[in-house]
Amino acid sequence: MASLLSPSMPVLAAVALTLTLAVIPEASTNAEAKQVVLGGVEPADPKDKEVQKVVKFAVRTYNDMDNDLYLSKPIRLMSASQQVVAGKNYYLKIELGRTTCTKTESNLVDCPFNEQPDQQKRVICNFQINVAPWLNKMSMTNFNCYNF
């Protein structure tokens, strides 16, 4: 009975491969096709609303964890990338500056940067933020900052 099934195995393998190539265009050998790396890190658009939400979350969390009496706010978003996982990981590099607002003040938008030479503080931080939209949850999974 095994000999009856043996000739059909190569046929089944060929059919499976053909269906896979037909259903997944990225698996084709077309040189112009975009290379897709599942789970790979890709650039994120800094102007995207989701990226802006993640930046605000990262800065708010940084301010909550930082021992400084004053709030910091973004000077510039240096880079942003994303990775599809169980949800999405965002990797952000943000330059932050100390403001004149203390942590008891809540409106960071209106806080000017502290320009007094002895009070200026600038840091560059790398943040990793995980977003699980089905749980309505963001969490900072890693970060490090350095003065410059």
From Swiss-Prot:
Q: List the disulfide bonds.
A: 101-111, 125-145
One BP annotation, GO: chondrocyte differentiation
Enumerate the spans annotated as Cystatin kininogen-type domain.
Answer: 36-148
Keyword Disulfide bond listed? The answer is: yes
- The residue range of the signal peptide is 1-33
Write one Gene Ontology MF term. Answer: cysteine-type endopeptidase inhibitor activity
Q: Which coarse location class applies to the principal site listed for this UniProt protein?
A: cytoplasm
Q: Which GO terms describe its cellular component?
A: cytosol
Instruction: List the effects observed when the gene is inactivated.
Output: No visible phenotype. Microscopic decrease in the calcification of hypertrophic chondrocytes at the growth plate.
- InterPro entries given for it? Cystatin_dom (IPR000010), Cystatin_sf (IPR046350), Prot_inh_cystat_CS (IPR018073), Prot_inh_stefin (IPR001713)
Alphabetical keyword list: Biomineralization, Cytoplasm, Disulfide bond, Signal
Q: Does the keyword Hydrolase apply?
A: no
Q: In which tissues is it expressed?
A: In cartilage, expressed mainly in mature chondrocytes including prehypertrophic and hypertrophic cells (at protein level). Expressed exclusively in cartilage.
Instruction: Please give the name of this protein.
Output: Cystatin-D
The organism encoding this protein is Mus musculus
